[in-house]
Amino acid sequence: MKKVRAIVSLLLALTLALSLTACGGQANSEPEQPETQEEQTAAEINLYVLSGPTGIGAMNLWAASDAGETKNTYHITMPGANDEVVAALSKGDADIAAVATNLAATLYNKTDGGVTVLAVNTLGVLSLLSNGQEAATVSELKGKTIYAPGQGANPEYILRYVLSGNGLDPDKDVTLRFVGEGSELLTVWQSDPEAVILAPQPVATSILMQNENAKTLFDMTEEWDKIAGGDSTLMMGCVIVRNEFLQANPGAVELFLQEYAASIEKARSDVEGTAVLCEQYGLIPKAALAQKAIPSCGLTFVTGAEMKTGLSGYLQVMFDANPKSVGGALPGDDFYYGA
């Protein structure tokens, strides 16, 4: 019996010792830290970016995300056409997308206000090129044939606006011929060496690099500004968000804007490095071409009231040219994030 009591006493002593040790450890441990604000708000984001200038601003973000250096986790897709972006946003496969500004307005109308524009990322990227011919003013293009991409989209309406602002009737004083893709412009002069070409970046840079006779006649951004006189700004590209995603993840959207702004700034300051990424991710075929084109790609980051003022004026011009260009109606004030 004494032996049993001794064993019981020993067990009780051990239990008490362990309890005291546990209590002591708990008292000395640091309280569990709450998640930081960034950790609480970060999210996985399905980001769609179109090829060309609209997508250049996302290249450094893409690389940073792949390296695990971003707060949000980005799954980036680069579709081949606007229709794929529209479908992805409609189905909820895309959360945020970099698109043309008139497409953003069209989506706003098609979805009954279901998307919001977060920032403008691209200004003017269009130039009128000739195969050696000279022209001092746009009005001197009367009688010329002008080849252009983007029928029914930004390029056509910008071209019409600039021609009309210089006293030319786009349907009578010049011959407009549209091509399906900007890359098709590379072969135009083989069949029509006297033609003038409306080329976006990086196609314009590629043409100038490959054809020693090619020259830039007019920068369309400069010509737009001469006509608009400050009433509107040529804003061709933007990033939009599905409102369902925005409402569910407001903090993640704010983080995106911070990380995206940094990506654009790096694209402007580190052109060579960004050009390498453009080739790596398949945005532009060759880094050498991208490096020459990026400084002319109108990269910017405009938000809030400044974005609303410039973009609403631009969309007004598009609407006046053809209401269908922006989806039949101008977007409401709720279209503009933070304005």
Question: What are these model-derived regions, one by one?
Answer:
Residues 246-321:
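Secondary-structure end/capping motifs
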Residues 60-62, 126-136, 233-251, 300-303:
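A bilobed periplasmic-binding-protein/Venus flytrap-type ligand-binding module shared by bacterial periplasmic
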Residues 24-27:
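Bacterial signal peptide processing site
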Residues 30-178, 195, 201, 217-218:
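Short, glycine-/small- and polar/acidic-enriched structural segments
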